[in-house]
């Protein structure tokens, strides 16, 4: 019974870490990556559609993204969606493709990005700890329903080890992303 709770908690913790990983991937570090456009949705015939389902996104150079919509009539909508998003890049279009030129990061912008990274990481840590708390509450409830105290204690210890493991993983991701961003 406790093993099922621990297994479920571990799955939820993995998902929390994956969310942080995806958030970090969407933060640009002066290099062009298609993942910075993952959250951009375009109004395609009145339906909000992810940009990566409407166009081919490629990286021909280190600081250039090229977006080639399959339907050329959607180019103005794609430009509007990029401008509205929090990407912070102005698109330029030649009628068939849209180019995004990623500017060099200023020291001020780098510091700002590090703050955003730390905030996202803290949200991830809090999510992992909340999962631990909820699972501990479930274990305590099961203990009242009759599972042995030593089994409950073992479950709580295992849960704490998992929590430490996933919080450490988030911390390592923060260090790596911080180094990537602060690299000039």
From Swiss-Prot:
<protein>
    <recommendedName>
        <fullName>Ribosome-recycling factor</fullName>
    </recommendedName>
</protein>
<feature type="region of interest" description="Disordered">
    <location>
        <begin position="137"/>
        <end position="158"/>
    </location>
</feature>
<dbReference type="InterPro" id="IPR002661">
    <property type="entry name" value="Ribosome_recyc_fac"/>
</dbReference>
<comment type="similarity">
    <text>Belongs to the RRF family.</text>
</comment>
<dbReference type="GO" id="GO:0006415">
    <property type="term" value="P:translational termination"/>
</dbReference>
<dbReference type="GO" id="GO:0005737">
    <property type="term" value="C:cytoplasm"/>
</dbReference>
<keyword id="KW-0963">Cytoplasm</keyword>
<dbReference type="InterPro" id="IPR036191">
    <property type="entry name" value="RRF_sf"/>
</dbReference>
<dbReference type="Pfam" id="PF01765">
    <property type="entry name" value="RRF"/>
</dbReference>
<comment type="function">
    <text>Responsible for the release of ribosomes from messenger RNA at the termination of protein biosynthesis. May increase the efficiency of translation by recycling ribosomes from one round of translation to another.</text>
</comment>
<keyword id="KW-0648">Protein biosynthesis</keyword>
<dbReference type="InterPro" id="IPR023584">
    <property type="entry name" value="Ribosome_recyc_fac_dom"/>
</dbReference>
<dbReference type="GO" id="GO:0043023">
    <property type="term" value="F:ribosomal large subunit binding"/>
</dbReference>
